[in-house]
Regions:
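Mid-to-C-terminal functional-domain signal that highlights helix-capping/loop sites
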Residues: 1-237
């Protein structure tokens, strides 16, 4: 099930199977600026950005996340030339095509107080969770650096910007040290000199053919990420 919350810029894919039953969902409302979805089978209400049922018979249950990436269409088409594209419903196509809606959303008032954090509520972040520990990475900082090596829960992580200059993936750095590369090799490890692509796979050098493990990550406005991950760390690099 593909979900997207316009108010918090959060796109997530969830497995709709719960207790062996496929649930069917529809939009139910908004809670603290994040979308709510309701399943037709039990009328339980679920938080879009966490996949948790917060009301109804299934309260406390969590949907399992399905790994996904938010990519530009050009980059996705390059990676998946035979991939299918979901067409918008004809009656609503004019709504999909509206320009400038993000600027409008960024001006909306939020009910989550972020003043103590010193970060604006609509600062776009990339949220990463490792071993139950959370960390938020300002998107602008990642796009500027192109390759960022850091730690979450003591584990080495690698954030990489795609050739389109907009898409981001996160990998388990596997205790290698990476720098920016060139061409298809967007990054190079200092340990062996191998070049690595945006899929996290070595395309040349001693480690050619080896692939890093991808880590789930998703974009979220700061107010929403902080609200659902109050103990989060924030990248300061």
């Amino acid at each position: 099930m593909v979900t997207y919350c316009t108010l918090c810029h959060t796109g997530l894919v969830w497995d709709p199977m719960v207790n062996g039953t496929r649930l069917h969902f529809r939009l139910a409302g908004i809670n603290n600026g994040n979308a709510l979805i309701r399943d037709e089978e039990t009328s339980s209400v679920w938080q879009q950005s966490t996949g948790e049922a917060i009301f109804g018979p299934l309260k406390g249950r969590h949907l399992n996340v399905v790994r996904s990436n938010e990519l530009t269409f050009a980059l996705w088409r390059k990676e998946q030339p035979q991939g299918d594209v979901l067409k918008p419903d004809a009656p609503y196509i004019s709504e999909y095509e509206k320009k400038g809606w993000e600027t409008y959303v960024e001006k909306t008032v939020v009910v989550v107080d972020t003043t103590k954090s010193g970060i604006g509520p609509h600062q776009l972040m990339l949220g990463v969770t490792v071993a139950g520990k959370n960390k938020a990475y300002p998107i602008d900082a990642i796009l500027a650096a192109r390759v960022v090596q850091d730690q979450v829960a003591g584990a080495p992580v690698l954030l990489v910007v795609g050739s389109d200059g907009a898409s981001i993936r996160v990998f388990d750095a596997a205790e290698l040290t990476f720098t920016k590369g060139e061409g298809d090799a967007l990054m190079q490890d200092a340990d062996t000199g191998s070049g690595w692509n945006f899929q996290g796979c070595a395309v040349d050098g001693k480690l050619a053919g080896r692939c890093l493990r991808e880590i789930d990550a998703y974009k979220d406005y700061w107010f929403d990420w902080m609200n659902h991950h109050p103990e989060t760390a924030v990248f300061k690099g």
